[in-house]
Amino acid sequence: MTRAKSGKISKNRHKKILKFAKGYRGRANSCFRVAIEKVEKALQYAYRDRRNRKRDFRGLWIQRINAAVREHGLVYSQFMGALKKTEIDIDRKVLAELAVNNSDGFVSIVEKAKAHI
C-alpha cells in the first residue's frame, strides 16, 4: 500500500487561509503561520460584532425615536408606555424608520399616544 500524504489537502487549506487574508498588512497576507492567527482573530471579531450590531442598532433606533418624540413634547419612555396602553404594536425599527422618512405617519402615531397619557 502506498503512503497517503496530505499534500493536496494542506495546499488547499493554505490557499483558503491566504485567500481569506488577502488585504492584510505585512506578512499576514503571504505567510501562512502569521495569516492563520490573523484570520482566526478576524473570525472571532466577526462573530462578536454580529451580536453587537443588534445591540448597536437598537440603541440607534431608540435615539432616533427619542429625538423625534421630543419635538412633540414627549419623552421616549412616556411615548413607549403610551404605545403599549393604546395597543399599537410597532417595533422600534419601524418607528425609527417612520420618524426619519415619514414624519406625517409618525406624527399621527404620536397624537394617538398623547391621548392615552
UniProtKB/Swiss-Prot annotation:
Matches recorded under CDD domains: Ribosomal_L20
Matches recorded under PROSITE patterns: RIBOSOMAL_L20
Q: Which GO terms describe its biological process?
A: ribosomal large subunit assembly; translation
Q: Which GO terms describe its cellular component?
A: ribonucleoprotein complex; ribosome
Entry keywords, A to Z? Ribonucleoprotein, Ribosomal protein, RNA-binding, rRNA-binding
The membrane-spanning stretches of this chain are none
Family annotation (Pfam families): Ribosomal_L20
An example Gene Ontology molecular-function term = rRNA binding
Q: Which domain of life is it from?
A: Bacteria
Known function? Binds directly to 23S ribosomal RNA and is necessary for the in vitro assembly process of the 50S ribosomal subunit. It is not involved in the protein synthesizing functions of that subunit.
Q: NCBIfam families recorded for this chain?
A: rplT_bact
Its family?
Belongs to the bacterial ribosomal protein bL20 family.
Which protein are we looking at? Large ribosomal subunit protein bL20
